[in-house]
Amino acid sequence: MEQLHFITKLLDIKDPNIQILDIINRDTHKEIIAKLDYNAPSCPDCGHQMKKYDFQKPSKIPYLETTGMATRILLRKRRFKCYQCSKMMVAETPLVKKNHQIPRIINQKIAQKLIEKTSMTDIAHQLAISTSTVIRKLNDFRFKSDFSRLPEIMSWDEYSFTKGKMSFIAQDFEKLNIITVLEGRTQAIIRNYFLKYDRVVRCRVKIITMDMFSPYYDLAKKLFPNAKIVLDRFHIVQHMSRAMSRMRVQIMNQFHRKSHEYKAIKRYWKLIQQESRKLSDKRFYRPAFRMHLTNREILDKLLSYSEDLKHHYHLYQLLLFHFQNKEPEKFFGLIEDNLKLVHPLFQTVFKTFLKDKEKIVNALQLPYSNAKLEATNNLIKLIKRNAFGFRNFENFKKRIFIALNIKKERTKWVLSRA
């Protein structure tokens, strides 16, 4: 009996009225046979003293794993009867709520698991409960928007909720808390949400970082009149890189598919896209050229195949150099000087840059970017991928808020002294 007493401590069952009678090891799980019994209380209806009647049919209560096996408690609860008014009552315990079968410790574990990126089906499988139980616990979470404040620095972006449909997300740049997740990214949806904030609150926003999605520009200016728009530097470089890539493909396709030039440009395309300062000087045998060459020597050979390729490559590298050194005057001076001399693919990018000049200058002068929100989007994609997608947007939204806005305390490890 003393061993069974220690088992109640091990299982963190603090109710002294629960007595463990036996433990049965099944093939797939453990069963803990227990009973709940205490002295008869007064009748809640008439006030007379009730008497012990019999035991209820065992309640099958799922519990946390023990020794790596699923565990459930078969708890027989005492019933009481009032012989004055015939009132029947079942014994109660803090282990589970009245009229419930899921113990509090399992509900706590569900909440803890929801903070992680695990899918709800996996949580249900790990805890030996139904997915519906996990969803009910998810619906217990309530997140209220605080319309009395906004951070001074915000990040805007979008992510894919369903195929072909993008959703909007806004994040506090410094604290990394999610401000809102909206089902669509149209101007009407975003405007209607942020207009819930008073104009005085919106005027306190100083910086908004975003990617190069032009419909956001005018909307941000109207909603946040004092905010500077900072474009994400990654997307600016990406525009130049894509223009260079398309230019390379067009020039490559001018050669015959079986020619040496076509095969060389196709095989070593990364050298053209790569920043020239990062080219390796190590010499290796290159089967395409049948000689030992460095990456820089290969690049020189590729550029010798086309004057257009060489001209646009050097221009591309010079733009990257000025951009990474954060020299907006030289960067835009080079664009303006070459606007009419470059291929239409580059002209399109240059015109976009000139149109968004103020926002790109902000990106070069201010130490803000969308990198933190892009990292958040990767976590959102992970939640979605683990769950094989979501049908219900509200459930998806709650998972995002739980995973990203609720901070999980880290265990502080204490090293033992030798």
Where on the chain are the PLM-derived regions?
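Short, conserved DNA-binding cores of transcription-related domains
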Residues: 1-87, 91-93
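Acidic/histidine-rich catalytic cores and adjacent linkers
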Residues: 40, 45, 51, 138, ...
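Short, positively charged, Gly/Tyr-enriched micro-motifs
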Residues: 47, 60-165, 202-205, 209, ...
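Non-catalytic alpha-helical coupling and interface elements of nucleotide-dependent molecular machines
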Residues: 48-51, 87-90, 115, 119, ...
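Gly-rich Lys/Arg/Thr-decorated short loops/hinges at beta-loop-alpha junctions or inter-strand turns
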Residues: 93, 171-177
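Acidic, glycine-enriched active-site microenvironments
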Residues: 99-110, 121, 180, 324, ...
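Active-site beta-loop-alpha junctions of metal-dependent nucleic acid enzymes
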Residues: 99-101, 179-201, 207
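Short alpha-helix plus adjacent loop in nuclease-associated cores
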Residues: 236-257
